[in-house]
């Protein structure tokens, strides 16, 4: 038995013991290093497990307070903030972005609506102009550059994963409407009141809790991606290569990149924090007497808004609601390139295989974080096995083309 598997700690309701078994197997058979999983059912914790090593260089163990970079789960954090403001009537989904951000109207963008941005249909999936080193650490410069961009496709006609840009597009709307940065709004009006450990822009006071991201595995579809990356004219090339160093492994564990408010890929959280953050949206928009949105806000968060068997950026099946990932494709997409969650669920995967989501039909909110990255752009077998076990425990079955249904 892997030593880390024998050190799993925390609590697990008897109904979800299969989740605990899979969590243990992740250490025994799937090369987990350090990780945590949390599940809330109807707002109450039913799984809260952790184990392994948080800092390989020192041997520091993963404990109940460990937090780690969760990268693109920041997109879901930002989308939650957007829906809070939409529900308050401060942002109109059908309004042009330029109504709030006049500088955005240049180069054929005057008619792009908030909903078009949130559904990855704006045609602005990357910065086409070259970003300088550490370019996404400078909010104002990144926003000015984004406002000058011209859509790659006609907005609203198709979709492609806005992997690096969507958080900045939404984050600037949040700043213009509230006067607060997205990280401040998240802490002051969402995660803070929920007492959820989730940040976009990590305070220095939280640094001692951070787990070190380690051991990036080879992409299971590396031959495919190597071919795509060798094509500079492919639009997705800049998703990887024009990020100002954001995707550079040398920057993953730096204080500067954890501190930066990057609402596309800059999330930091614990599994417990993610389960708590999504908990209101697994119910009616409220938990423990704290209401974030009215029940009428939930359909826009849940219902698919854009879907394709071949996302223009990822060249894989993807589906999005307004701001959130839904189930992505079938398991035949290959390890690391699918996200199989409930038909009614919404959330986001994070680089390396973490995930946070809510499912109002199943009444669960879910957070899984780890520090050993897997390949692909979705869930690898570690995270997916935990999701699968949770849904089976609730009596769900897996469907074709790839989601869990009752």
Language model: regions and residue ranges:
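Short, compositionally biased leader-like segments
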Residues: 1-16, 322-326
């Amino acid at each position: 038995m892997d030593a880390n598997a024998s050190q799993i700690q925390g609590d697990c309701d008897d109904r979800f013991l299969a989740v605990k078994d899979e969590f243990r197997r992740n250490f025994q058979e799937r090369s987990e290093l350090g990780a945590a999983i949390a599940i809330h059912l109807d707002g109450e914790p039913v799984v809260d497990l952790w184990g392994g090593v948080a800092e390989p260089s020192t041997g520091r163990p993963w404990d109940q307070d460990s937090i780690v970079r969760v990268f693109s789960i920041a997109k879901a954090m930002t989308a939650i903030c957007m829906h809070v403001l939409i529900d308050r009537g401060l942002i109109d989904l059908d309004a042009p972005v330029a109504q709030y951000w006049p500088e955005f109207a240049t180069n054929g963008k005057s008619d792009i609506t908030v909903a078009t941005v949130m559904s990855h249909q704006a045609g602005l999936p990357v910065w086409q102009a070259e970003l300088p080193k550490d370019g996404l650490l400078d909010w104002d410069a990144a926003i000015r550059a984004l406002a000058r961009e011209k859509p790659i496709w006609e907005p609203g006609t198709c979709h492609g994963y806005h992997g690096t840009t969507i958080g900045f597009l939404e984050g600037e709307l949040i700043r213009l409407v509230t006067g607060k940065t997205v990280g401040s709004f998240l802490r002051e009006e969402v995660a803070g009141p929920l007492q959820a450990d989730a940040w976009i822009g990590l305070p220095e006071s939280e640094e001692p809790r951070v787990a070190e991201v380690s051991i990036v595995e080879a992409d299971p579809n590396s031959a495919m991606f190597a071919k795509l990356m060798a094509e500079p004219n492919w639009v997705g090339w800049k998703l990887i290569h024009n990020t100002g160093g954001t995707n550079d492994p040398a920057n993953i564990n730096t204080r500067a990149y954890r501190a930066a408010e990057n609402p596309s890929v800059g999330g930091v959280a614990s599994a417990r924090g993610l389960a708590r953050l999504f908990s209101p949206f697994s119910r009616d928009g409220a938990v423990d007497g704290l209401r974030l949105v009215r029940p009428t806000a939930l359909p826009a968060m849940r219902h698919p808004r854009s879907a394709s068997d071949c996302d223009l950026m990822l060249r894989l099946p993807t589906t999005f609601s307004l701001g959130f990932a839904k189930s992505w494709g079938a398991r035949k997409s290959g390890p690391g390139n699918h996200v199989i969650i409930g038909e009614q669920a919404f959330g986001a995967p994070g680089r390396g295989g973490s995930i946070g989501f809510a499912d109002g039909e199943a009444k669960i909110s879910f957070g899984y974080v780890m520090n050993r990255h897997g390949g692909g752009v979705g869930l690898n077998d570690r995270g997916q096995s935990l999701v699968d076990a949770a849904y089976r425990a609730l009596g769900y079955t897996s469907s074709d083309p790839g989601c869990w249904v009752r």
